[in-house]
């Protein structure tokens, strides 16, 4: 049953994120949610380390975190916002749902992300109707925009 969770906690640690999102290593791209306002906005981050497997090939002599993974991190953050806005922190319901991204628009990459960076995802709800959510925002390092995008997603039953 869809609900509106305005009094949701605003911070979630990795143990909470793992109970809501289905992603796992190496594709879980959120370490912590530091701000969440249901139906409105979310701020989360991932610490980028030299130990990321992706740096073995992108690029061995000049490691740059791939832009597509930045967008995926934004998508996961938006999915976390949509789910918790509808059902709050409910791991049992999370086992029955999955977020599918439908469109990714207006993507721009501005500054490379490298090991040692704390990659922050700042997203806000642009609109939503039922299980369809549109979010937009930026990825930032040290307050500087490194990427931006708009994403549309659908929450579906997990089969």
UniProtKB/Swiss-Prot annotation:
The keyword Lipid metabolism applies. Its EC number is 4.2.1.59. Keywords: Cytoplasm, Lipid A biosynthesis, Lipid biosynthesis, Lipid metabolism, Lyase. It is found in: Cytoplasm. Coiled coil: none annotated. Involved in unsaturated fatty acids biosynthesis. Catalyzes the dehydration of short chain beta-hydroxyacyl-ACPs and long chain saturated and unsaturated beta-hydroxyacyl-ACPs. This is 3-hydroxyacyl-[acyl-carrier-protein] dehydratase FabZ. It comes from Helicobacter pylori (strain Shi470). The lineage of its organism: Bacteria, Pseudomonadati, Campylobacterota, Epsilonproteobacteria, Campylobacterales.
